[in-house]
Swiss-Prot record:
Tissue specificity note: Expressed in ileum, trachea, and the major salivary glands. In ileum, expressed to the crypt and villus epithelia, whereas in trachea expressed in both surface epithelium and submucosal glands.
InterPro entries: CLCA_chordata, CLCA_N, CLCR, Ig-like_fold, VWF_A, vWFA_dom_sf
Entries under Gene3D superfamilies matching the protein: Immunoglobulins (2.60.40.10), von Willebrand factor, type A domain (3.40.50.410)
Protein's name in the database: Calcium-activated chloride channel regulator 1
Recorded family membership: Belongs to the CLCR family.
NCBIfam families per the UniProt record, alphabetical: choice_anch_X (NF041940), hCaCC (TIGR00868)
Pfam families reported for this sequence: CLCA (PF08434), VWA_2 (PF13519)
One GO term describing the cellular component: extracellular region
PTM per Swiss-Prot/TrEMBL: Glycosylated.
Entry EC number(s): 3.4.-.-
Taxonomic lineage: Eukaryota, Metazoa, Chordata, Craniata, Vertebrata
Amino acid sequence: MGSFRSSLFILVLHLLEGAQSNSLIQLNGNGYEGIVIAIDPNVPEDERLIQNIKDMVTKASPYLFEATEKRFYFKNVAILIPASWKAKPEYVKPKLETYKNADVVVTEPNPPENDGPYTEQMGNCGEKGEKIYFTPDFVAGKKVLQYGPQGRVFVHEWAHLRWGVFNEYNNEQKFYLSNKKEQPVICSAAIRGTNVLPQCQGGSCVTKPCRADRVTGLFQKECEFIPDPQQSEKASIMFAQSIDTVVEFCKEKNHNKEAPNDQNQKCNLRSTWEVIQDSEDFKKTTPMTTQPPAPTFSLLQIGQRIVCLVLDKSGSMTVGGRLKRLNQAGKLFLLQTVEQGAWVGMVAFDSAAYVKSELVQINSAAERDALARSLPTAASGGTSICSGLRSAFTVIKKKYPTDGSEIVLLTDGEDNTISACFPEVKQNGAIIHTVALGPSAAKELEELSQMTGGLQTYASDQAENNGLIDAFGALSSGNRAASQRSIQLESQGLTLQNNEWMNGTVVVDSTVGKDTLFLITLERKFLSPIPFFGVPSGRSQDSFLVGKHNKMAYFQVPGTAKVGMWKYSLQASSQTLTLTVSSRRSSATLPPVTVTSKMNKDTGKFPSPMVVYTKIHQGTLPILRAKVTALIESENGKTVTLELLDNGAGADATKNDGIYSRYFTAYDANGRYSVKVWALGGVNTPRRRAPPLWSGAMYIRGWIENGEIKWNPPRPDINKDDLQGKQVCFSRTASGGSFVASDVPKSPIPDLFPPCKITDLKAGIQGDNLINLTWTAPGDDYDHGRADRYIIRISTNILDLRDKFNDSVQVNTTDLIPKEANSEEVFVFKPEGIPFTNGTDLFIAVQAVDKTNLKSEISNIAQVSLFLPPEAPPETPPETPAPSLPCPEIQVNSTIPGIHILKIMWKWLGELQLSIA
């Protein structure tokens, strides 16, 4: 364990270039190291949970080893224990491990009894996931009947997380037609089982045979496929790892390419094993010839937060009022962002370093004010970043080890010697957050964040964008309880002329309101009167404290701010004003609405697009239909505004999961870009009753035991728009960090961006053998603008359509004019050039083309099956018995002929026709 902990920094340096990942996982030989499993602070203390986690991983490792043909196993795992749990000698202090970079989170179910394991996946096929979520009851083995053994489920979720594969089942469509037969959505197709219909009432279920609809040929929606307990087939883990004999992923030879599941839709019909083979992990390993060792574990307990500000006061900080803006942002951090109980120190540097404050524990406003008074007020000299860092290490070591401490480093200058202290940075184990101010900040600055797992941000000299305050506002601790974290409600700025006003509204919702702070920055002074704020009760609020030296005014709302709309009006002339509003959680039982944002990579090379993601949740519940806007600002000062969408199209991987996404293609220069998002929730903004388990192990509806089908209760239908009756109204802003662009050509920038891939193509039969297609329109440049035309092709062979798209039959699309990106497209056509008769399986794909003839990737492949229902049997008139013969009372059974038997036979024949159609 010791050698792993000491080598953690070296491992972090080998993260994939450009990947925006907080994870510390590394593949060392064939073993995964640096896995962090965090117990959420809301989980009640229970030491057994730690042993349960160990048992789960220990059982998962050999299963992973076998499933990957002796390539991978779990080597060591860090278990992150909440600060509120009782300390023990075996619990050590974390180094770089935090809740932010945890790979697995064990948290309470929300809502109760919703113990489904799942993995949050923002990206597309082959892209790593974000986190795995388990509940304490699941880890304890109390949900084996519902999901299977914990170790096997962990491997299923690990494949989502590490290799970006998807599920091979489909809760929304469990059967499909192929060659006139109903087929279950399974992988591999060789899995044997029974198709049955459970009819449940109360706690008991009756099993009945599935029946096909006479019009569609499909089984009832409630039908289930129950696998046989004994199978000869060994795949697939992404379908049902709960089957005892399933020990492999689906491979190309046994992959069910026709099954309508996420793996086929998102991965272009490739098997999970093919995707895994394309991963960097697979490419740099060879199978082991010996059995792997059992995993080892380190127990880490979160301690007090220790932060040292390292602030540039060199001569260049006088440019554009940078030092004044530093004071304003630093004051926000010290007065509001940093949590009560944290230890904070401060170092300023130019060509040398100066200790402005030793570590001070924040217990009251007095410590906050004293630290704020220590902020540097004069700028001169050169820039020596290493001097500032070394001084910060010394300040921290006077009271605590540097492991797990944090340094906030702000600089605006170049420093060619910054790499000289990289070895000391690795050795000291502090997490370094970097703030690059202006266009000339040291180019190596981001390396410090990347090697230590810190946040990297960039603030331009455009004061009205409020970038510096946003950067400091993003530095709330992710390791503290949710009630202590600062939440930013508003961040606005405007340059006013001729006594103009800046007016607006801030929503204080019921999940926040504690420690609410309104902060205004200015360049000179306010015109009379002082800023006006109208509180929801209708009264005005003008009790602002005005700082003369750092040009700011602020108002701390006493107690809990009143829920409602807070209106503001600020007046000035020929100067820039900014407004920042932050608050904290108001209720111990009601989770706050939180907004987090990130880019898919921290470096972008033209013409590769970037993707901006924003996650909006209340606890673990996703917030839907919010209005989310991203502002992306380059070093040139150009700002691009993007509307982010949760529509399951373009850059957005999954619809209605509370993750809003959009491609960014509007490069205008090389260098740094900052990212900021606004999120607004109004009367049409609901939340789900439960998180969508899109990438989770399959819920076991039933199983066969001693020849009899046993049933679990129906799983709550949480993937539907099952929404709370209470709407969610809120306003939030958040920093998405920064990224660095390269290879951007000089203006005019050529059009090298094709339309994005269509990922939600759906097809159905309409009327007289017509096919109805729907999809979300791509754009001219990925998901922006309007495509020029569509190419639609069809085939009766799914692989021919995928691999020989240009040779497949083309549909006439003369009358199909593309709509604006993200609009719904509908197109109806009659197949020509291919016989379309009863039982025909037809596969359809679409390709978008832009005005410069750049083509998108081929869409997901949609399928329709032409099913002509059999003619209904003619009604047989009842026989009239001869009047002279009495009609005896009879029981209907298989030995007595007559009208009853005839009706039964007709019914049976009809069912037989449907079952073999």
